[in-house]
Amino acid sequence: MDDQRDLISNHEQLPILGNRPREPERCSRGALYTGVSVLVALLLAGQATTAYFLYQQQGRLDKLTITSQNLQLESLRMKLPKSAKPVSQMRMATPLLMRPMSMDNMLLGPVKNVTKYGNMTQDHVMHLLTRSGPLEYPQLKGTFPENLKHLKNSMDGVNWKIFESWMKQWLLFEMSKNSLEEKKPTEAPPKVLTKCQEEVSHIPAVYPGAFRPKCDENGNYLPLQCHGSTGYCWCVFPNGTEVPHTKSRGRHNCSEPLDMEDLSSGLGVTRQELGQVTL
């Protein structure tokens, strides 16, 4: 009986003894899972932090790149020659032409000379050519030999040779026109009236309500024209065309030089039209 009890008690104690070694194994697995989870969380947090800092640094690098490009463009703009005005500046100044000139502005200062440049076809061509290459068309105000010498000094060798060849051809052409026959005396041609003189000749000296232009001693239009009946005065081009935005009852001064950045180009067209012709 004692032996059976010992066997039964031993048999009942064996499962309990067999279960005890499994508890440390479960604890070690739980700790391993916890450690792996914490490590993964730390790695993800590190990756997120790194991405955030890289995003901030990328924004700063973009700003530095834009600033560097702006500085380079500004440096190039400062190195460009300032003889020719950019077309963009002329277009930005164009809206000033659309604003009517008030009487206060007319009385504050004299109107600058917009009659220095005509509005004929040759004036348009000259203005456009000087804009594209102002150094190729110098100011020639001396005598004919002085102007030729100045041209030779200002032009390069190739262009001067071309110009010299053209002068030779022109000289031969002029020499070939000379005739050995005696020239018959020709009658003096009748005096041709200028446009201003012809217009004045059709209007009596005293004619109320009619506009009678004023001419100088050479028959050209005076820069300042006035209508006595209305009291308005305005500036005109050499061909008598009215300069835009100069008609008022204020004081005028049409003899001062015109600044190219002022109201108009001096050619009877707006700066916007000149920009369109250039493009």
UniProtKB/Swiss-Prot annotation:
One of the entry's Gene Ontology molecular-function terms is: protein folding chaperone
Segments for region (Disordered): 1-23
Instruction: Give all Phosphoserine modified positions.
Output: 9
Main localization is: membrane
Keywords (alphabetical) are: Adaptive immunity, Cell membrane, Chaperone, Disulfide bond, Endoplasmic reticulum, Endosome, Glycoprotein, Golgi apparatus, Immunity, Lysosome, Membrane, Phosphoprotein, Proteoglycan, Secreted, Signal-anchor, Transmembrane, Transmembrane helix
Q: Which residues are glycosylated?
A: 113, 119, 265
Q: Which residues cross the membrane?
A: 30-55
The record places the following residue ranges in the Extracellular compartment, namely 56-279
All copies of the Thyroglobulin type-1 domain together span: 193-254
Specify the inducers. Expression is induced by IFNG and LPS, through CIITA.
Q: What does this protein do?
A: Plays a critical role in MHC class II antigen processing by stabilizing peptide-free class II alpha/beta heterodimers in a complex soon after their synthesis and directing transport of the complex from the endoplasmic reticulum to compartments where peptide loading of class II takes place. Enhance also the stimulation of T-cell responses through interaction with CD44.
Report what the protein is called.
Answer: H-2 class II histocompatibility antigen gamma chain
Instruction: Give the species.
Output: Mus musculus (Mouse)
